[in-house]
């Protein structure tokens, strides 16, 4: 996966010479600095699983008119973003395998153009995926705190504008990232975007969890059943931990990698961290696999429609 143009910088900082990197890496920690050799088959397998999962989500939402609402449209867009992550990963891996085995022989200029197209798709899907995770969090927040006004706040027109804005911004940002990938300011913007989404989700989901605990506590005190409060609080805490934990675990290492690229590109310990770049890509692809389980498959209506889709009862 090292052909990624903007992520080529991410993997091997342009302002650190190859010699400095290898020497620093060798002196920093020995064997554990050699990185992790991840087979292409794992990239292909995870990409295929994610592609199938997210295709099913999109098909189910399109099929069932009961799911034609802003909330499910946002989930559908997240599935499309994750699907693009999978497709770009599959294309990249297959492209590399065919070239490595001599099956595909292409001029270097064409390879660069194809590489840039795939890179743009990857960057756009990463930005849009992060964006729709934030949009879904905001949508859930409005659903809980402004339930009576939800349909007047989140109209179909506003939902369409939101989705179009995210896709447009993702396309523009990916183009800028591909063009100016050697500029640290671009990486800082990407890091800032991730931190903003992380803080946004933390604040919104914790506030929602606090409100849920308050409601359950008041109900249990009226019914004099503290067990209800403890059970519901535990379930809410588990859900919150899963939501934020998956987001942080899957995306955190990659963006921490970006932070190190900007702050210490030649530091021996940083170069050790850089050697695990493929692992961070695997975690991002894993996020595309897990997203449908968290945001889509928990809906009973969507699960029922998925069964119909799988059984081809259109």
UniProtKB/Swiss-Prot annotation:
Q: Name one GO molecular function term.
A: melanocyte-stimulating hormone receptor activity
List the stretches on the Cytoplasmic face of the membrane: 62-70, 139-161, 210-237, 298-314
Cellular compartment(s): Cell membrane
The record gives the membrane topology as: Multi-pass membrane protein
**Where are the bilayer-spanning segments?**
36-61, 71-91, 117-138, 162-181, 190-209, 238-263, 277-297
What's an example Gene Ontology biological process for this entry?
Answer: adenylate cyclase-activating G protein-coupled receptor signaling pathway
Instruction: Identify the GO cellular component terms for this protein.
Output: cytoplasm; plasma membrane
Pfam families attached here?
7tm_1
Q: Which residues are glycosylated?
A: 15, 20, 23
Name the source's superkingdom. Eukaryota
Q: Which UniProt keywords apply?
A: Cell membrane, G-protein coupled receptor, Glycoprotein, Lipoprotein, Membrane, Palmitate, Phosphoprotein, Receptor, Transducer, Transmembrane, Transmembrane helix
Q: Which InterPro entries does this entry report, sorted A to Z?
A: GPCR_Rhodpsn, GPCR_Rhodpsn_7TM, Melcrt_ACTH_rcpt, MSH_rcpt
Q: Which PROSITE patterns match?
A: G_PROTEIN_RECEP_F1_1 (PS00237), G_PROTEIN_RECEP_F1_2 (PS50262)
Topological domain (Extracellular) residues are: 1-35, 92-116, 182-189, 264-276
The lipid of kind S-palmitoyl cysteine is covalently joined to 312
Q: What does this protein do?
A: Receptor for MSH (alpha, beta and gamma) and ACTH. The activity of this receptor is mediated by G proteins which activate adenylate cyclase. Mediates melanogenesis via regulation of cAMP signaling in melanocytes.
The record's similarity note reads: Belongs to the G-protein coupled receptor 1 family.
Protein name (Swiss-Prot/TrEMBL): Melanocyte-stimulating hormone receptor
Q: Which organism is it from?
A: Gallus gallus (Chicken)
Q: Which gene encodes it?
A: MC1R
């Amino acid at each position: 996966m090292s052909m990624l143009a903007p992520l080529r910088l991410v993997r091997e900082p342009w302002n650190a010479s190859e010699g400095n990197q290898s020497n620093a890496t060798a002196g920093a920690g020995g064997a554990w600095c050699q990185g992790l050799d991840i087979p292409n088959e794992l990239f292909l397998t995870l990409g295929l699983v994610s592609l199938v999962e997210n295709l099913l989500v999109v098909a189910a939402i399109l099929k069932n008119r009961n799911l034609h609402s802003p909330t499910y449209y946002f989930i559908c867009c997240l599935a499309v973003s994750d699907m693009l992550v999978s497709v770009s990963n599959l294309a990249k891996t297959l492209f590399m395998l065919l070239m490595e085995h001599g099956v595909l022989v292409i001029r270097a200029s064409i390879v660069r153009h194809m590489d840039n197209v795939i890179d743009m798709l990857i960057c756009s899907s990463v930005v849009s995926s992060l964006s729709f995770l934030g949009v879904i969090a905001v949508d859930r927040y409005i659903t809980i705190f402004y339930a009576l006004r939800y349909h007047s706040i989140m109209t179909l027109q506003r939902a369409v504008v939101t989705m179009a804005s995210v896709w447009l911004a993702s396309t523009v940002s990916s183009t800028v990232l591909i063009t100016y990938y050697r500029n640290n300011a671009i990486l800082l913007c990407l890091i800032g975007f991730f931190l903003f989404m992380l803080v946004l989700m933390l604040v919104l989901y914790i506030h929602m969890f606090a409100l849920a605990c308050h409601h359950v506590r008041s109900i249990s005190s009226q019914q004099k059943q503290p067990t209800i409060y403890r059970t519901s609080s535990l379930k809410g805490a588990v859900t919150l931990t899963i939501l934020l934990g998956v987001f942080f675990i899957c995306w955190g290492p990659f963006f921490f990698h970006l932070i190190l690229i900007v702050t210490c590109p030649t530091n021996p310990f940083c170069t050790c961290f850089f050697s695990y770049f493929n692992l961070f890509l695997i975690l991002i692809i894993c996020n595309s696999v897990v997203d449908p389980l968290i945001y889509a498959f928990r809906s009973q209506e969507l699960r029922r429609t998925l069964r119909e889709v799988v059984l081809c009862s259109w």
